[in-house]
Amino acid sequence: MTRFLKGTDRPLAEAYQLALLDLDGVVYRGKNPVEYAADSIRAAEAAGMTIEYTTNNSSRFQHVVADQLKGFGLDVEPWQVITSSVVAARMVAKALPAGARVQVLGAEHLRDEVTRNGLTIVDGPQDRPQAVIQGWYPDMTWQMMADAAFAVEAGATYFVTNRDLTIPRELGIAPGCGSMIRAVITATGVEPVASAGKPEAYMYDEARELNTAEGHDLVPKEASIAIGDRLDTDIEAGNRGDYDSLAVLTGVTNPTELMLAPSHLRPTFIAPDLRELGEAQPEPVRDESGTWECRKASAWFENGQVHVSDPTSMDGLRAAVCAAWEAADQGAQLSEATVPVFAIEA
C-alpha cells in the first residue's frame, strides 16, 4: 500500500516533542550556516520542541560540533550532538560484558567513547580482542586495516560507525568510512554485525534514550520526527525505525529525486527549509478523478507523464510527489523525463 505525504493541523514544532536533526545540508553546509536554520530551531525550542543533532561523522567531538552551532547563535549542549561514535560505543557496550577487550580503528573521539562506556581498548590482534570497532579515520594505514582484519578473522565481533562510501571534501568526493570498511570485509569475508550510523535506525533510538539521561521522560517514536536532506540516510533511517520524517531541500535532495523516490526513501513531510517547523503541514488529497490537490495546487498522471498546475510552489511539489508515487506503485516507469521540472520560489 502506497504511503503518501501526511498533513498536520498545527505546526510541526507543536505536533512533535523531539526533532532528530541531521547537520550538514540542514543546519550548516561545511562551515556556513543554512539560511533560516538557526532562527527556525530557536523558534521550535521556544514552542517546546527538544532538538537533538544526529550525524554519521565519527571523528568530531560533541563539544566541537556544539561550539560550531553556538557560533550560529544556537544554545546547544554537547549531549544534544549524537555522533556515530557515541552510538557505536553504546552499541558495543550493550553487546559485550563490562570491561570487554575492544580493538578500535578510528579517531580519538571514538576511542574516548569506547572507554567512557566501560570497555577496554587493546592494541591489536595479539591481545585477543572480543570486538573490533571501525570508524572513519583519515590517518588509517594499511597495517591498521590488516590488524583489524586479523582480529576479525580470529573471531572478534565486527562493529562499524557508519557505511557511507563517500565523503564530500573541498576538492571533490573522497572515500568515506564505508570504503575503508570494504577493505576489511574483502580481506575477511565477514560483514559487520551492526552499523551505528544512518540509514540504520539505531542512531534515532539511541538519541531518544540519551535524552532521558538529561532528566526527560522517554519520548515515544510517534512524538519524534527525523529531519534531513538525504533520502538514502536520514529518511531511510526514519522509515526503518518507524519514525515520521521531514525532508528539506537545503541539501542534496531535489524535487525530481523526491518524485522518483522508491517507497523505502519516502518522507512523511517535505519542506523548502526549517521554517516549516513553525507551520502546519497541508495534506495532499486525491479526488475521484485521480487528481491530487494540495490547497490551490494540483497534479495528475496522464499518458505516462506527471503534470502539475504550479511548478513554482511547495504545494505543487507536494501534489506532484503524491501523483508520482501513486503512479510508480501502480507500475508506471517514471524518470526525469516523465516528471515536471520545479523551480521553487522562496
Predicted regions, residues:
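Asp-based, Mg2+/Mn2+-dependent phosphohydrolase catalytic module
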Residues: 2-21, 28-31, 42-46, 66-79, ...
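Conserved phosphate/oxyanion-binding catalytic-loop motifs
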Residues: 57
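Polytopic endomembrane small-metabolite transporters, centered on the Drug/Metabolite Transporter
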Residues: 84-86
